[in-house]
């Protein structure tokens, strides 16, 4: 099944709901970055939330989202536009679980991310706007909920989940974002709060093979009207030419130093780990163009 997001209105158009399945793109990220389970869960939640956020803007803004925590994962970055995402992670080799309590043995994403900030930069026709908020728990969903309330002034509830197998493969990923519209009544808010309180976790919904359609029915108490469906995917978009052009922008001295010291240039894409080699002939062409 392809990854996709549904956008719906519910409760007499008082609530907007986004629901997603993102298993394929999160698994692709895991393979590209070789993440261990807790890093996979953190990155997967971040990718899913970012993909949904990118569908909220109709003018084609490219979003760059960063979670900069003091936990072992370090900084994570996602670029997102119209449901297409790519990501980087500073330390993919993180496998932390709860050692005690009711969550014993489960992935401890909050500790892996730590304290820090969530920032969002919107690139609209090369005009850049950045807003940020402090991380609340490092669990990603809570952090996006707080971001929407403080930076976008949009009361929201964000639920995210990633299920990783014992073999480290991502077997389910998805989530939802609920946005309260300005004219929502107290009755609707109470009803919605009651429904959300009965959901143990998004992971439980995913384990039960609930689709985005099912999630809308549950969250909307069967009042949802689906308006849009968007495919989600992980796509890097890098190419040999793009990195050739980037290298060519180095000054002549820097290029000559690379040529004389290394004889070639090696570039590794941080979003997909693809390696590009530029030979002495390539470097000579770049130098000659100066």
UniProtKB/Swiss-Prot annotation:
It is found in: Cytoplasm. SUPFAM superfamilies: Hsp33 domain, HSP33 redox switch-like. Disulfide bonds join 236-238, 269-272. The keyword Chaperone applies. GO terms for molecular function: protein folding chaperone; unfolded protein binding. Keywords: Chaperone, Cytoplasm, Disulfide bond, Redox-active center, Zinc. InterPro entries: Heat_shock_Hsp33, Heat_shock_Hsp33_C, Heat_shock_Hsp33_N. It comes from the Bacteria. The keyword Disulfide bond applies. Under oxidizing conditions two disulfide bonds are formed involving the reactive cysteines. Under reducing conditions zinc is bound to the reactive cysteines and the protein is inactive. CDD domains: Hsp33. GO terms for biological process: protein refolding. GO terms for cellular component: cytoplasm. PANTHER family: 33 KDA CHAPERONIN. NCBIfam families: PRK00114.1. Redox regulated molecular chaperone. Protects both thermally unfolding and oxidatively damaged proteins from irreversible aggregation. Plays an important role in the bacterial defense system toward oxidative stress. Belongs to the HSP33 family. This is 33 kDa chaperonin.
